[in-house]
Structures are given as C-alpha cells and as structure tokens.
C-alpha cells in the first residue's frame, strides 16, 4: 500500500470506529472491536478491514484525485449554487463522514503525514464549505431585505400579493384571537377581487348592502393624484398616524354574548354644544329638503333627546370637526340635540354643503328606572330658518349606552337612521336625500286605530328626484330592555316607501 492509501485507510477506520460514518456495512461490522487500535496503529484490522481492498483503494483514489488543487474556491463552493452536482457532492461528503471533528482530522494527519492530511482535506472539501455556512445546494436566499417599491415584474408581483395577502389575513386573525379585539381587513387586488376579514361586530360593514355599496363606490372611484395634505401621506405610510378620531365605548355587553344585530357598529349621534332653541311648529304633512349636487354624502337633520349632564369635548379631524361626547345620566325630555346641516361623511375629506335646516324632532318622555311609568314616543316636525354651519357631533359606538340615543349608518347615497333600542331586531331606516336637483320629501302621518298599535311615518319622494331603496327595513315596536314587567316603551315606526313601487309597504 502506498503511504497515501494507508493514511486514508487509517482515517476511514477511525471515523468508522467512532460511529460517525455511514459506511458501517454488514461486512465491516464484525471488526468493530478492534477499530480503535486499527485506527491508531494502522496495523490491527478494524472496520477498515471489513471494507475490502477493492473498496478501500477506490476511496483512496477518489481522495487522491481531488488533492492537487485544494483552493479556497473549491473549499467553499465546489460547484454552481443551482447545479445538481452540488447537492450530490454534499450528499457524498455526508456519506464519507460529515460528523468528523477537528481532532479526528488531526489524528489522520499524524498517522499518514502531510500527504494523507492533504488527501483527507481534499476528500472533504465540501464539508469545509458547509461549515463556513455557504452550502452549494441551497436554493433560497433566506431573509433578504428588499426595496419598498412597486414590482414591475407581473409574475413576481402576483406571487408577492398572494403570499403577503395570506400572511396579513393570518396576522389579522391572530390579532383578533389573541387579544380579543375587533379587526376589519379589506384587500383589493389589481385583478378586481376583494378579500376581507372581519370579526363579529364588524361583519355588517362587509355583509350588508350598504357596506358593500360603500366599498364598491370607493374602489370604483378614480385614483386621485397625490395631494398636498400631509395627513393623507402620513396615513399611507407604515410609520404614519394609525390612530383615528373614531372611538367606541366598551361595556359589559361585549363579553355577555349578545346577538350580532344588537352589537352592530354604528355612528351614534350625541350631544351638540352651542345649539340654539329651535322654532317648534304644529305637526304638518310635508317637509322640504334641498340638497345640492356634489361629491359628498347626503345631509339629514333631525332632533333627538339627549342627556342633560353631558359636557362634550372637541376633537379636530381631517374630515371636519368631530365632537366626541359621552352621556351616562338619565334621559331628559326637555333637552334637544340638533344634528347640523354641514357634516360630510367621506373618506379623504370634502367640502361641506350648506343646506337649510329641515329636521324631524322626536319627543320622548323621561325613561327612568321606575317600573310604574310608561314612556311613549310621538313624532312632530319642526323647522328653523337660515343656514346652520355648526360642527357635526359623531361618536362611534358598537353598543347603545343611553336609551334616548340614535344610530346612523352612512352610505354613499343614504343615511340610515334608527333608535338604538330598536336595533335589537335588526331594524333600520334609510333616509335618502342624495339627488342631482332640489327635491321634495314628503313625511305623512297615519293614525292607528287599534290599541297597542305603532304610529307610522311614511317618507315618500316623487319619481326621479330622491332615490330611496325599496328594500329598506322598517322600525318595529319593541320594549326597552331593563324595565320590569308591565312597563314598556313604544317606539315610533318609520317606514320608507317609494312612489315608483306599485304597492305601499305593509305596517307590522
């Protein structure tokens, strides 16, 4: 045997005896007892004897073939990163003993001399590359920081969208599940598909017809050029102002498992400071509502009872002044809240419209905790001259907090209005005032003869002027929650009808 072959045999015998190699064949296993002495002295047969002279010579020849040029490039790469040979070389190196330690290689150098050490080093070239962290057969680059810019390659862009959309949906689910928060996520692809994730309270934003119409209106609108408004740019930035001016009150009913209809998110209209006394007139049968055409939301004015012990605080926002207030005291029938005419519900902000005040006033008797008093609701119409430009009072609340509160659902072409205590059965009324020309909206009263009936108010419009959805849901009569048996509160039922239909809506 040549010295080179003897050194290689000794190294192989040592590695096999320590159990770090995959070359433990059935023929080599009987000689395992003398493996240690065979490796140290090179004379006593160990596992190396079990390999047979033919196999050993082939291994030594393969090791000697790679000896002449053990350069740094061969040590680190060995082949192209994408080639198949790189993987084969790496697997072959693992079969020849990937778990050998540095001390074992030093033993091989001592036994076989410089030539054996060179042969061993050359034979395990890819192993050194694996230790350095640059595996030749690795297909992915791992974590690489990419530039935050639009991807021009269409295939790469589609792939990135698919992966990251799935990831952000998963993150939204994890956020809502781990922390119990309400999450609404909407992703619209460039192919026209809309993907959404919403928790229980926010599902009506994407399942109701009004919510779908609002989403489609926003997505179908032309993309406006970048504006000089700094707030818009900051909100589109990852490090911008994430918090909005919208707030909602969290109460015990969030964890009591109420129905989804009761916990619908909504805009709750609360107290407005600076409201002057309105001129009350006798109930009439019509009211004129003039709305100038423009790219803003419709304006609906009405009066509602509010708490007398409210001290609101003003908060400024990009879409106009928003006053947030909370009411927790008993409802007073003497206090009137007037929603002004110049509030606009539109993303991005819009110029508020000036509309003469025409309002629907709701008188409501005090609803105390006393079980012996019944409260009733009657509907009258008031009107005041001039133009009101007071700021809007809007407060988001997912749970009704006061009995006299009212809720509004904004939409691109309508404002949905309903008392909070009437939302238990999913009732909703659409007050639609969006038109291209001044129009007239009729409010007619109907008397109910049978006892226990619900007074009704019909909002009708002439054909072609005011578009009122026929599928509007009526407000039904229901008892106010929290009062004892024998005491109930009748709510006024508002029915929205359209003169275009052949038949009028039936009263419940």
Curated annotation (Swiss-Prot):
Phosphoserine: residues carrying this PTM: 77, 79, 83, 85, 103, 224, 253, 435, 446
Subcellular location(s) per record: Nucleus
PROSITE patterns: MADS_BOX_1 (PS00350), MADS_BOX_2 (PS50066)
Sequence ranges of Gly residues compositional bias: 29-53
GO biological process annotation, one example: mesoderm formation
UniProt KW DNA-binding keyword: yes
Function field: SRF is a transcription factor that binds to the serum response element (SRE), a short sequence of dyad symmetry located 300 bp to the 5' of the site of transcription initiation of some genes (such as FOS). Together with MRTFA transcription coactivator, controls expression of genes regulating the cytoskeleton during development, morphogenesis and cell migration. The SRF-MRTFA complex activity responds to Rho GTPase-induced changes in cellular globular actin (G-actin) concentration, thereby coupling cytoskeletal gene expression to cytoskeletal dynamics.
Name of the protein in its database record: Serum response factor
């Amino acid at each position: 045997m040549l010295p080179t072959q003897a050194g290689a045999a000794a190294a192989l015998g040592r590695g096999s005896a320590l159990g770090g190699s995959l070359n433990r064949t059935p023929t080599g296993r009987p000689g395992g007892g003398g493996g240690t002495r065979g490796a140290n002295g090179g004379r006593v047969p160990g596992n190396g004897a079990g390999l047979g002279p033919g196999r050993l010579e082939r291994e030594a020849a393969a090791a000697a073939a790679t000896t002449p040029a053990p350069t740094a490039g061969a040590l680190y790469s060995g082949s192209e990163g994408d080639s198949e040979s790189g993987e084969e070389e790496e697997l072959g190196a693992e079969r020849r003993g990937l778990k050998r330690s540095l001390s074992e290689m030093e033993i091989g150098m001592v036994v076989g001399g410089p030539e054996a050490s060179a042969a061993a080093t050359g034979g395990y070239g890819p192993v050194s590359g694996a230790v350095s962290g640059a595996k030749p057969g690795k297909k992915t680059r791992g974590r690489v920081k990419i530039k935050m810019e639009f991807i021009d390659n269409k295939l790469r862009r589609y792939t990135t969208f698919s992966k990251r959309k799935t990831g952000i949906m998963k993150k939204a689910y994890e956020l809502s599940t781990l922390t119990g928060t309400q999450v609404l996520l909407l992703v619209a692809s460039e192919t026209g598909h809309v993907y959404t994730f919403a928790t229980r309270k926010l599902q009506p934003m994407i399942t109701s017809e009004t919510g779908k119409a609002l989403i489609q209106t926003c997505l179908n609108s032309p993309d406006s050029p970048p504006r000089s408004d700094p707030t818009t740019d900051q909100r589109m930035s990852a490090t911008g102002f994430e918090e909005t001016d919208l707030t909602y009150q969290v109460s015990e009913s969030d964890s009591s498992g109420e129905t989804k209809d009761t916990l619908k998110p909504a805009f709750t209209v609360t107290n407005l400071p600076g409201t002057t006394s309105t001129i009350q007139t006798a109930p009439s049968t019509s009211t004129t509502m003039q709305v100038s055409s423009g790219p803003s939301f419709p304006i609906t004015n009405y009066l509602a009872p509010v708490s007398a012990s409210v001290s609101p605080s003003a908060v400024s926002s990009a879409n106009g002044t928003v006053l947030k207030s909370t009411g927790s005291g008993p409802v007073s029938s003497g206090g009137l809240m007037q929603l002004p005419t110049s509030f606009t519900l539109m993303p991005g902000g819009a110029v508020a419209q000036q509309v003469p005040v025409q309002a629907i006033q709701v008188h409501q008797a005090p609803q105390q905790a006393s079980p012996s008093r019944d409260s009733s609701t009657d509907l009258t119409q008031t009107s005041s001259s001039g133009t009101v430009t007071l700021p809007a009072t809007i407060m988001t609340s997912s749970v009704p907090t006061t009995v006299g509160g009212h809720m509004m659902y904004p939409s691109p072409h309508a404002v949905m209005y309903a008392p909070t205590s009437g939302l238990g059965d999913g009732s909703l009324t659409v007050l639609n005032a969006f038109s291209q020309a001044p129009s007239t909206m009729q409010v007619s009263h109907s008397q109910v003869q049978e006892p226990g009936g619900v007074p009704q108010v019909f909002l009708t419009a002439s054909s072609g002027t005011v578009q009122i959805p026929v599928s509007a849901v009526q407000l039904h009569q229901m008892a106010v929650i929290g009062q004892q048996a024998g005491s109930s509160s009748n709510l006024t039922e508002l029915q929205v009808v359209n003169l275009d239909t052949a038949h009028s809506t039936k009263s419940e």
